[in-house]
Every structure is written in C-alpha cells, then in structure tokens.
UniProtKB/Swiss-Prot annotation:
InterPro entries xrefs: GcvT/YgfZ_C (IPR029043), tRNA-modifying_YgfZ (IPR023758), YgfZ/GcvT (IPR045179), YgfZ/GcvT_CS (IPR017703), YgfZ_barrel (IPR048451)
Location(s) in or outside the cell: Cytoplasm
Protein known as: tRNA-modifying protein YgfZ
Biological classification of the source: Bacteria, Pseudomonadati, Pseudomonadota, Gammaproteobacteria, Enterobacterales
Organism: Buchnera aphidicola subsp. Baizongia pistaciae (strain Bp)
Function: Folate-binding protein involved in regulating the level of ATP-DnaA and in the modification of some tRNAs. It is probably a key factor in regulatory networks that act via tRNA modification, such as initiation of chromosomal replication.
Transmembrane segment boundaries: none
Keywords associated with the record: Cytoplasm, Folate-binding, tRNA processing
BP-aspect Gene Ontology terms: iron-sulfur cluster assembly; RNA modification; tRNA processing
Major location (coarse): cytoplasm
Highest rank taxon of the organism: Bacteria
Length: 318
C-alpha cells in the first residue's frame, strides 16, 4: 500500500484525490411494495427519509444483531444503498427471505463503478462536469444516470455511482493524475465514526453498540421491524455496555478484523472489545475501529491486541 495514501487523511488537502471503492457494493430495492417491505426490515423510519438526503441505518437479525450497515437513499421509484462488499451477498439473501409474497426486487448492480473523491478542489472540479452537485441542504444529486452522494465527515468528500460505460466516467478520471488506494476511503470512514461491518464480524453486535442512535439510524417508535423487540429492550432497560471507538497506534503483526482488544489496568491487561476495521497509515501508525466495553477512564488508557506485546493503541475519537 502506498503510505502517502493514508497519511493524506490526517489533513484536508487542497488537491483533488480519487479512488475506486472496490470494497463497497451498490444495491437497489424496487417494486410497488418496496417501501413497506424495507420499512419492516431496517432500523430507520422511511417515512422520515427525504429525496435529497442519504441516511445511515442497519439491517438486523430477528435477535437484533446487526447483519450490515447501510447508507440508504431514494433512487428512481424505489431505494438504493451502499454497504460493504463482503456482506452484500449474505445481506441480500437475508433481505429476500420473506419477499416471495411482496412485489419487491432486490438487486446488486454489477454494471456500475463506485468512486470516492476528496480534497478542497473536489467541488470546483466536479462542477466543471455536472450542472450541480450536492450542497449544504442536499446530500444526494442525480444527473445523467450518475448519482453523487456528499459526505461531511470527517471533511467534505463525494461518493459517485456511475455505469462502467458512461462517457462521463472518463471526464471524472481526467480530473486527477493518479488513482489512490481504496483504503483511503476506509480510513475516512473510521475517522467519521461510520460503523464498518464486514462479513466476518456481522451478527455480533446490537445497533446501540455501533453508535446507531448517535447517527440517527435507529428508530424506536416506527413500529415493528426485524430485531425491533430486542433492540427496544436494550434501549429502555439501558442494557448496552459497548460503544464504537476510533483508536490509533502501532502493532506488529498488523491486527485483523475480529481480533480481541485488551486494556491496561494497573500492571495487567484484560479483554475489553473487538476490532471491526484496520487501516495501516504508515510503517509506524495504524488506525483501528473497535467496539469496546464502556469504561470511564478510556481517554487515558492504553490498549493492545490480545497477547501481542508489540502493540500499543489509544482512543482518538474523544
């Protein structure tokens, strides 16, 4: 991996940068029953969704455990969402389980490309190609079969969904001199506290443990949906004891998704959480996203990967 790729994330560079989002998928949900069907499956209340906005929500098991995290928005006469590619096939199969009696079509689009664009020049450069792009009031813009999503965290950036053979693609690619590694986007997602749920870590956490309430992706009043009973119980009885965190540090070897994290207490280490995502920033720095047990003194605490003496991490997101 090119080290300059990730170091960029520490500063909002002026220069426009572009990456292919190879580890994300684009799914559409259409049909006359798509609203009611999705409403009974996801944690967000679709009645509140506006056509010019994208939102974050989760799709859960009947027991309330998160199968995947979705970035969802209205698209044509239905809905569309972005999720991690490693979970897409499994998530679609789960979503389709009860669709036999509904007029709904759930499809992973394979004829499209997802691009991530960032940098202070990004808006100006994109306006050379498009009539408009998302702004302060809008986070979704669609033009000529191209969808542009605006992200505000950790700073302004854009996700573009475009068909592989769309002539506009070449115009977009001509804006940059080189293509950056796709993990630059993953690092930005970690820095923005977007929960990264890949296949090998799904069905493990409740939405509250992934900060879905803070992200306005969890509705407890909309009525029945998959996992709602257990999710509501956790909320009203205050049973959640885990929270999402962004940690920075060093480890050799590089940690893996699902690895256990330990916190230092006096002279000993005890287990306190799990890794959701890992990005190597440079030879001396690694970012990880993790779910940790609630503990009042985390700000000054030292963490490590379980039984790895050559690892050292601290919380960055507070």
């Amino acid at each position: 991996m090119n080290n300059e790729l990730i170091e960029y994330n520490l500063h909002f560079s002026k220069t426009i940068k572009l990456t292919f989002l190879k580890d994300w998928s684009f799914i559409t949900v259409t049909g006359k029953d798509c609203f009611n069907y999705l409403q009974g499956q996801i944690t967000y209340n679709l009645k509140l969704l506006k056509s010019n906005k994208h939102i974050i929500c989760s799709h859960c098991t009947i027991d309330g455990k998160v199968l995947s995290i979705l970035r969802l928005f209205m698209h044509n006469d239905g809905y569309a969402y972005i999720l991690r590619k490693s979970t897409s096939k499994f998530q679609i199969n789960e979503l389709k389980k009860y669709s036999i009696f509904s007029h709904v079509n759930i499809c992973q689009k394979k004829d499209i490309i997802l691009l991530g664009i960032m940098g202070r020049e990004a808006r100006t450069k994109l306006l050379q190609i498009f009539k408009n792009i998302p702004h302060e009031r809008d986070s979704v813009y669609q033009e000529n079969d191209v969808i542009i999503l605006k992200y505000d965290q950790p700073h302004e950036r854009y996700l573009i969904i475009i068909k592989k053979h769309n002539l506009i693609l070449n115009k977009i690619l001509s804006l940059v001199d080189k293509i950056y590694h796709h993990k630059i986007w993953l690092a930005l997602e970690i820095a923005s506290n977007f929960p990264i749920i890949d296949y090998n870590i799904n069905k493990k956490f409740f939405p509250q443990s992934l900060n879905l309430e803070k992200l306005n992706g969890l509705d407890l009043k909309k009525g029945c949906y998959y996992g709602q009973e257990m999710i509501a119980k956790i909320h009203f009885k205050k049973l959640n004891k885990h929270y999402l965190h962004w940690l920075s540090g060093y480890s050799y070897p590089i940690p893996k998704i699902g690895d256990n994290i330990e916190q230092k207490k006096n002279k000993n280490f005890s287990s306190c959480g799990w890794i959701l995502s890992v990005v190597k920033l440079s030879t001396t720095k690694i970012w990880i996203q993790a779910v940790l047990k609630h503990y009042n003194h985390y700000k000054t605490n030292v963490f490590r990967i379980k039984n790895k003496i050559n690892s050292f991490f601290y919380i960055t997101d507070e």
